[in-house]
């Protein structure tokens, strides 16, 4: 289980091209614009301007997803959170939005719609919550 990181991007919402490029960076690690551009153009059915990749990398940096380092004359972008951390942050935010509804009828309707596998997952989550509570009580 990946713990919730202390650092979070400033803006979680990403467009389709931003998401695609972020996944490329998670796969490759530290990248240049050329690395990303070449990866996208490896698909013969794709067209994308080099400057568009630069713009998206800059936007991902402004949103807090990437850091940019200059080495010599080249700029390298690297992720500030791992893919697993991003998934944990996303799940945490979705759970908080769900709980913010604060309407027992909505929560009950959700619980009624769960299948057996989902119920087992919720039971496992409940057990982890209980274990975390016991740990806090010991402190």
Segments predicted by a language model, with ranges:
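Amphipathic alpha-helical dimerization/coiled-coil segments
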Residues: 89-134
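Short, cationic-aromatic polyanion-contact patches
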Residues: 71-90
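Pre-recognition alpha-helix immediately N-terminal to the DNA-recognition helix
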Residues: 19-23
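Short acidic, hydrophobic short linear motifs in intrinsically disordered regions
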Residues: 31-40
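Glycine-centered, phosphate/nucleic-acid-interacting loop/turn motifs that mediate DNA/RNA or nucleotide
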Residues: 64
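Short, Lys/Arg-enriched N-terminal segment that forms or immediately precedes the first helix
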Residues: 1-11, 90-93
């Amino acid at each position: 289980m990946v713990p919730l990181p202390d650092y979070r991007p400033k803006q979680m919402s990403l467009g389709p091209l931003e998401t695609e490029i972020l996944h490329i960076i998670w796969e490759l690690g530290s990248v240049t614009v050329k690395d990303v551009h070449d990866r996208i153009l490896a698909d013969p059915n794709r067209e994308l301007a080099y400057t568009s990749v630069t713009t998206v990398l800059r936007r991902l940096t402004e949103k807090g997803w990437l850091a940019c380092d200059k080495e010599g004359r080249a700029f390298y972008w690297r992720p500030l959170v791992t893919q697993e951390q991003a998934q944990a942050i996303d799940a945490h935010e979705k759970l908080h939005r769900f709980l913010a509804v604060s309407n027992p009828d909505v929560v009950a309707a959700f619980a009624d719609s769960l299948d057996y596998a989902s119920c087992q997952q919720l039971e496992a989550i409940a057990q982890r919550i209980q274990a975390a509570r016991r740990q806090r009580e010991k402190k």
